[in-house]
Every structure is written in structure tokens, then in C-alpha cells.
Amino acid sequence: MENLNTKDEKVMNGKFEDEKYSFDDLMNIIRRLRAKDGCPWDREQTHESLKQCLIEEAYEVIEAINNQDYRNLCEELGDVLLQVVMHAAIAEEGKEFTIEDVIGGECKKMINRHPHVFGNLEVKDSQTVLSNWEEIKQKEKKYENISDSILNIPKALPANIRAEKVQKKAAKAGLEFESYDQVLGKVYEELEELKEARKIGQKSYVEEEFGDLMFSIVNLSRFLHVNAENSLTNATNKFINRFVGVESFARQEGKHLWEMSASEIDTLWGRVK
């Protein structure tokens, strides 16, 4: 590497004792790892190969937040930052863009989307801020209609989150149920259609109707003002805790769950519930 100052040289040569590091240091470390005489694994990575890593690191951040483990949160945020820097380094090598482009683009976006802070626009509350944000985003992306906005919601999002985003945008365009009762009625309607599909027995039809039921349940969550993704996560965690409790009681009795009858397991389930 050329044009390195003394600190850069120490970082690039792995001399880490008692150093305070900066963002530039991290960028230089990744460049060193991806150099010809760097790390074979790091050199092999591409935008494509790192996709799963980015997803996993993001979920580990969420896990730390959910656990209120802020020491671990610091570490996990660093891992997410590492992913950003890795992608920027790969792009830099391919002359696609640089980390400066990433940072500069985000700075411009934040300034442009906060005219009430960096301009003269006056706002009443946070809801107005969100409305302005969406309007500015529409102009930036050159969306001509709501359909353009919906079509650009990432397909890689978790299904519950994507469904909710689609429903919210459709609601802003006027495609919305008028009441909770209407939404609940739609859930029951989709459930009946699923029952009919099951009677027919065609797997693709069952899957389609099950998807419709799930979509309507996400819609119901909006009217209940609860987060569908969080609700399902909490329900899953509750089931896991109860299962662990049931198995613990079974072991105390010197038994394995697979050796027990359904009624015996149900009795233990009632104890932990």
C-alpha cells in the first residue's frame, strides 16, 4: 500500500498494541486482508457471497437489542459495520463505488429528507416528518405513482414485514378496510377458503390460500396496532420456553418425551403453562 502514514503502517502490519482506531483504520485493515498477500478467505468474498453474512449480523444486532445486552450490541454493530466496509472495499476494487460515495450519498439523503432541520420547512409532529420523508423519497426515486413505490419494496424482506409495508402503502392510496370488524371478517373468509382448498387437496391451491390467510392476519395486526413479526417471534419464544419446561418435568420423572403418551405430555404442558 502506498502513501501510508506511521499509524497506517502499524495497522497494516498488524501492530495493534494500545491503539485507538478510526474508521479509516478499519478500511485499511480490510484493504490489507484483501491484498494479494492478505487472507485467502477475505480475498474470495464477493457481494453475492456476503449476503447471508449481512443478514445474520443484522439479526444478531436485533437479538442484542431484544436482550438489552448493550455490551454485546456494541460488538454486533461493529460486525454490521464490517459488512458495510467489506462491500465498499469490493466495490472499490471493481471501480463500482467507494466508501466515500456510500457516506456522501447517505449524508446528502439525510440533509435532503430533513428540510425541517436543514431548510426552512416547518412541521407539526413526527407524523408530518414521515409524510414529508415519503414524498421526498418519491421524488428522489422518480416514482410516478403508488404502484412504483410498492413494486420497489425489497422482495428479500421477511414476508411479514414486506406484507405490512405493501398494505400501508396501499392504504395511503385509499385501498383500505374501514374497520377492525371488516378486517377480522376477511380473516375468517380466508380461513374458510383454506378449508375448502384442503378438501380439494391440491398443494399449490392450499399454499395459495394459506398465503392469503397469512396476508389477512398481517393486515389484522395493523388494525390492532401490533407488530406481526414481533408477535410471532414472542409466540415462538413462549413455545420454546414451555417446551423446555415440559421436557425438564419429564426428565425429573425419569422419562423421555417420545416415550410418553399425548395425555401425559398434555398434563406436563398444563403445569408449565
What label would you give each PLM region?
Residues M1-E76, L82-F210, M214-K273:
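Flexible "arm" and connector segments at domain edges
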